[in-house]
Amino acid sequence: MNIKKKLIYSIISSKDTKEKESEEIVVKLSKQSNKKIYILHRALIHQLSNHRNRNAHTQTRGEVSGGGRKPWKQKGTGRARAGSNRSPLWRGGGVIFGPRHKKYVNKINKKEKQLALRILINNKFKNTIVTENFISKISTPNTKILVNNLKKYNLDTNNNILIIVNEKSNDLYLSTRNLKNVELLAANHLNIVSLLKANHIIINKDALDIINKMYND
């Protein structure tokens, strides 16, 4: 059974960092706490599994080209018998029990994934700052301006910071690229790992509207 919970965010002015207004969003959450953990675990495994890619791939004796002819006759040469020069015992032969390419696919329902994201949005509520327009002063790629903007909200780049905007701009991407603890995401591309990892979240007001529409179906 799902319950509805109201989250009231204070909209902080980008000029003087004072509260300008407030905005309310309603998130649907699971009533059972053990179900929340289960859903989060499923969503996390889904994302991590689908990012795995085992490329190492060795060939068995049946896959190595050549070796169709018997190297020498079975008897009379004094040598050990051999049926193919692509045997794993031979140089250039196949590999026994070597690594094989494998796809790690873990499926999850859309509603389960959305519920997991809503649970995390609720859990990170106290560590979330909503700004009127965070990127107003960044018209060219400039990491220093970005760091100074974060400091205005008492955010330290030594902590993991997630910036959520309504639309990713190239200037903002280039400004955050050099900061290892700062991640930039568009509101329509939220993911479990980024939300779990973030110590602080800063959201554009327009991005909050997108989150409210997208993840509450």
Swiss-Prot record:
Matches recorded under SUPFAM superfamilies: Ribosomal protein L4
UniProtKB keywords: Chloroplast, Plastid, Ribonucleoprotein, Ribosomal protein, RNA-binding, rRNA-binding
Nuclease found in the keyword field: no
Localization annotation: Plastid, Chloroplast
Coiled coil segments of this chain: none
One Gene Ontology term, aspect cellular component: ribonucleoprotein complex
Signal peptide from the UniProt entry: none
A molecular-function term among this protein's GO annotations: rRNA binding
One Gene Ontology biological process: translation
Region (Disordered): 51-85
InterPro entries the UniProt entry points to: Ribosomal_uL4, Ribosomal_uL4-like, Ribosomal_uL4_dom_sf
Pfam families: Ribosomal_L4
Highest taxon of source: Eukaryota
Homology family: Belongs to the universal ribosomal protein uL4 family.
Function comment: Probably binds the 23S rRNA.
Subunit relationships: Part of the 50S ribosomal subunit.
Name assigned to this protein: Large ribosomal subunit protein uL4c
